[in-house]
Amino acid sequence: MRLPRTPSQTVGPFFEFGLVTKTELVESGAPGAVLIEGQVLDGAGDPVPDGLVEIWLADAEGRYEGNFGWGRCQTGPDGGYAFTSAKPGAVQEPDGTVQAPHVTVLCFARGLLKPVLTRLYFSDEADANAADPLFGAIGDEGERATLVATATGPATYRFDIRLQGDGQTVFFTTPASGL
């Protein structure tokens, strides 16, 4: 018996069995819980229904301990994703530098040979964002705005990831990972 091959793609196909997802880092309604939601959009502004979003974040005290702040979500037909987490606190580096509360976001999508890496900052942390060394290193105000999640309700933030085109989200490279 001969089985047909799956269609050729730039990357993939990806198989769901064995894929670990984790969208609730804390229970919905827990003290300090926030909902982070958004869409992954392509260059034309169309949803990416087969993407994958990973997040890493510190706990409410700004510490990275264990697997507290890790999540992974497949995008839905509308390109949407959502995580329930505690809002991260400011992170103090050993040299005394303070990073604003933020979420590190990794996005996998069709057509990308490598995932893209960005950061999500919170709109209600404007003073902390302004003092954050990475956020402040981005000279263009419009580009900085692509990194800010907008509060859309009580304990709810929206962060859309635009992969290219007008309003493209700012993406970063990291020398250690090669991303």
Language-model-derived ranges and their functions:
Residues 1-179:
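Beta-strand-dominated extracellular/periplasmic modules and repeats
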